[in-house]
Each structure stands twice: as structure tokens, then as C-alpha cells.
Amino acid sequence: IIGKGQQKAGTIYGFNVSGSVADPASKITYLRDAVGMTKAYMDFSSRVFNYGSWRDAFFQPRPCMLGYDGHVLYYLDPNDYSKKSDGTSSDISNDSFEGNAMMEFPKIYWKVEPTEDGKGANIYIADYAPDDGFHCWCNIDKDGNEKEHFYMAIYQGCTINGKMRSVSGK
């Protein structure tokens, strides 16, 4: 087991946000493992999000069906939640299914360093904590323990048979 601050092979994406550059399209410079990647953006003319080089980045959330016991039963097609990732039909609108449509978020460590001029910052996002300046803010349970994932409902909550549910169309 690798503890906090110990080195391991992993990914550290970084970017600099320059407070000295007025043009928003030019404010960001990629650092570390992000160097050479292409930007993600919303293509409003086609109404399709363009992930650039970021589609398979470790921090991308994944839609899934989460069982009542807290285990992922299967992943959903990210472009069509009515299908499982294998292309078969999903249970997103099945109110008798013993689970909920949820978005799974992986553990992410963050570090923010103000630039020397005080006008910008270097921001790092990693899948591990390479030093004590990296913190995992989102994946902490009620006892202060880091968890590999956290989940959020995909759909607005509704009550079905006395249970709060995340089900499509309800």
C-alpha cells in the first residue's frame, strides 16, 4: 500500500491560469502530464461536447446503476443512458430495479499553487498524492476516510415504495 506523500507511478495533470493574460482562450497553459493534450470544449453549432484529449482522463465521471448495497451493478453508455455499456437495454426507468441511476466520481487529489506574481495559479489534478500539498476533498466519508468513488444521482430524486430513488421519467 502506498501512503500519502509516497511516490508511485500515476498521473498528474497540471495547468497554469495566468492572471496577466486578458484573452480567456489564451489564459491556460498545460503543465506536467497535460502537456500536448488538446482542449475540451462545447461545440454549440453541433450541440456535441468535444472532449479533445480528455475523454479517457482518469477523473472523468461514469454513469452507472448502483445497487441498494452500494455496489456498481453495471455501467451505462455515456452517450445513451437507456443502454448498458455493452449496448443492451438498461434499467434507468425500471422502478422495480433494486438500484439507482448514479454518476460515479473517482478519487482525485488537488493542489493549487499561486504564481510568484500573485496574479495566477498552477493547478494540479492527480490520481494519487505525490506530496503533502495534494488533498482529496471529495471522496471522504463521515469518519474522515478516503473512498475510491463517490456517487451522485443522475435524476431528480423521487419516492417509490417509501425509498428515495434516481429513476428516469419519475
Question: Model-found features: residue ranges?
Answer:
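Extended, Lys/Arg-enriched charged tracts that mediate electrostatic binding to polyanionic substrates
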Residues: 57-133
